[in-house]
């Protein structure tokens, strides 16, 4: 059976080397996130200040995989 994951939304607060990011979740927890392969292949840029969806394992809640970059509400796109 495939492992179940939690999906949270959060804000990128800091960009770290090797595609890692420090993310503040909506419940104020700070976790370490990395970019998923689909986002990396699609050349989607993730910068500090972006809101993202992150998938967190139930076994290690301090690390997660960024699966979606949310559109900013104040952008003109």
From Swiss-Prot:
A Pfam family per the record: eIF-1a
Keywords from the named record: Chloroplast, Initiation factor, Plastid, Protein biosynthesis, RNA-binding, rRNA-binding
Major location category of this protein: plastid
GO cellular-component term (any): chloroplast
GO molecular function list: ribosome binding; rRNA binding; translation initiation factor activity
S1-like domain ranges (all copies): 1-71
Cell compartments where the protein resides: Plastid, Chloroplast
InterPro entries: NA-bd_OB-fold (IPR012340), RNA-binding_domain_S1_IF1 (IPR006196), S1_domain (IPR003029), TIF_IF1 (IPR004368)
Function: One of the essential components for the initiation of protein synthesis. Stabilizes the binding of IF-2 and IF-3 on the 30S subunit to which N-formylmethionyl-tRNA(fMet) subsequently binds. Helps modulate mRNA selection, yielding the 30S pre-initiation complex (PIC). Upon addition of the 50S ribosomal subunit IF-1, IF-2 and IF-3 are released leaving the mature 70S translation initiation complex.
Family: Belongs to the IF-1 family.
Subunit note: Component of the 30S ribosomal translation pre-initiation complex which assembles on the 30S ribosome in the order IF-2 and IF-3, IF-1 and N-formylmethionyl-tRNA(fMet); mRNA recruitment can occur at any time during PIC assembly.
Protein name: Translation initiation factor IF-1, chloroplastic
Species name: Daucus carota
């Amino acid at each position: 059976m495939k492992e179940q994951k939690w999906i949270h939304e959060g804000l990128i607060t800091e960009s770290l080397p090797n595609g890692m990011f420090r993310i503040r979740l909506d419940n104020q927890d700070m976790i370490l996130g990395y970019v998923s392969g689909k986002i990396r292949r699609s050349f989607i840029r993730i910068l500090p200040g972006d809101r993202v969806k992150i998938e967190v394992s139930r076994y290690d809640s301090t690390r997660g995989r960024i699966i979606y970059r949310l559109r900013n509400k104040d952008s003109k796109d």
